[in-house]
Amino acid sequence: MMVPPEYGGSGADTVSYVLALSEVAYSCASTAVVMSVHNSIVCESILRNGTEDQKKRYLSKLATGEIIGAFALTEPNAGSDPSRQTTKAVFDGDSYILNGSKRFTTTGKNAG
């Protein structure tokens, strides 16, 4: 919802997004979690930290629902405590190598 129009989103402000999220949560908490992960974690992370190429490549598809974002936090020996996690991302040349394991990936089954 908060993805700017230049990337295919509606450009909703934070208050409007939270009000919409609250209304969704009244009806279905699970759907609100998916909405929150998709918008607050995935889209917002790309907006704040992504390259211009990544923003152009992913945000319009995320904003229209063509693809769904996912979030992997929980690890077998750390639970959801980020201070105990051991998964690492190491930059190698022009890409990242990921090593580790996750127990749950929120919306992982439907992620694009």
Predicted region positions:
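Short, conserved beta-strand segments within well-ordered enzyme catalytic domains
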Residues: 1-2, 19, 34, 70-72
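Glycine-rich, Trp-frequent "lid" loop and neighboring beta-strands that shape
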Residues: 7-10, 53-112
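Glycine-rich loop at the start of a catalytic domain that most often binds anionic cofactors/ligands
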Residues: 8-25, 47-50, 86
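Structured helix-beta-strand junction loops
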Residues: 27-30, 64-65
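Active-site PLP-lysine loop of aminotransferase-like
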Residues: 29-35, 102
